[in-house]
Amino acid sequence: MDFALNLTQEQRLAMTQEMQLSIKLLQMSSFELQEYVEKELQENPVLDIKESNVDKVEKDKLEYKEIIKNLDFDNYSHHSYDRNPDEEVSPFNFISEEKSLKEYLKDQIRDLDENQCIKTICLYIIENIDDRGYLILENEEIEEELKISKELAAYCVDLIHSLEPHGIGARNLAECLKIQIKQKDMDEENIFIMIDKYLEFIAENKYNVIAKELNIDVKQAQEYGDLIKTLSPKPSRGFYTGESVRYISPDAYIKKIDSEYFIIMNDDLTPRLTINAIYKDIINNDTDKDAVSYVKEKLNSALFLIKSIQHRKSTIYRVLEKIVEIQKDYFDYGESYLKPMTLKEIASSMDMHESTVSRAIRDKYIHINRGIVKIKDLFTTGMAASFSEENVSSLIIKNSIKKMIDNEDRKKPLSDQKICDLINEEGMNISRRTVAKYREEMGIKSSKGRKRF
């Protein structure tokens, strides 16, 4: 009886652990899952990666390259290299694709017609530029650390400021913007005053206040503001700074073949896991009880993981299958055909819990004929429409708001209330607060912020 009770408890515990892992993996993004699997591969010796044919070919290539490296090319040159002897090797072949900001700056310093002492000081300053392109040292610190004069430190910092990208080596946003203005050969004092004192007013479109303070025309103040807005607040933008860029990879591809849609799961996102055969032999043949117990524990953990990854894939697939069924018009014709669709609706139709659907779409993406789409964006709340039995998608309303704003008179932009009235005239029932909410979600300023003088 005790044995049966213990067995039942162990089975329940195992089931609980498996369910917890399943839930945990389901809500992970593909990137988070990759990191988790890599960690498990390091910690669990029973886990192994199933080698694909592509991996084997790449492995063979690497082994072949190693063999070639050890060959005596003096003896084999007439057989192994058939490049035209007159063909020039481009120096660009040896340039790294990811040239860092600091490397780019150092190259410019080396090309300057300055003595080696000044170049060395400039190289030191470059090493103290952060990932944004800002200098983290004051002139006094440079003087003190390098034991140089005030004039020499200032001269070298000015040299850094003359480099590209413009604005490099500034200590703060205002200095960064002013360096860029100087590079444009502009010396209008009011622009510098606006940068020093009125950046917040520029952001809030309060050009009437700025114009009054500077005793200039409102239109002129706005033109200066427009110029300032074209400047980069982050000089390092576009350069490799040592941080890896994470690109979005879709969890699945939605492909239309003839008149039917197919869901192709992206299996490249996670390694194909298997059980290392060596550890299977230990369980079957080893007499060391501790070793067998350890391997069994790790084996159960590995099997839980493999099963949970398969369950994650299956759940996402099933949810996508239902989405494609409901949103066929969206996939065929575009955003304006997106139907209102809720988590509850999907869950109910699949006999699945709403929280499971929520986890299945969290931070997941699909690739469709118009690009990569976040699955969550396909779930919209509905607004009542007097002209249709179906609700109108919030995305359709957002498109209407954006279209109205794009076509408005810039000198007399539409208020949220006016947009609300116009949308209601089209037969869609919506409040002013909802208009404001959707406008802000699209990153569009209020009528006050959009006004042109």
Curated annotation (Swiss-Prot):
One of the record's GO molecular function terms: DNA-binding transcription activator activity
Alphabetic keyword roster: DNA-binding, DNA-directed RNA polymerase, Nucleotidyltransferase, Sigma factor, Transcription, Transcription regulation, Transferase
GO cellular component, one term: DNA-directed RNA polymerase complex
GO BP terms in the entry: DNA-templated transcription initiation
Metal-binding listed as a keyword: no
Key word Disulfide bond present: no
Protein origin, superkingdom: Bacteria
Ranges annotated as DNA-binding: 342-361
PROSITE patterns: SIGMA54_1, SIGMA54_2, SIGMA54_3
InterPro entries: RNA_pol_sigma_54 (IPR000394), RNA_pol_sigma_54_core-bd (IPR007046), RNA_pol_sigma_54_DNA-bd (IPR007634), RpoN_core-bd_sf (IPR038709)
Position of sequence motif RPON box: 431-439
Similarity comment text for this entry: Belongs to the sigma-54 factor family.
Function: Sigma factors are initiation factors that promote the attachment of RNA polymerase to specific initiation sites and are then released.
Family annotation (PANTHER family): RNA POLYMERASE SIGMA-54 FACTOR
Name used for this protein in its record: Putative RNA polymerase sigma-54 factor
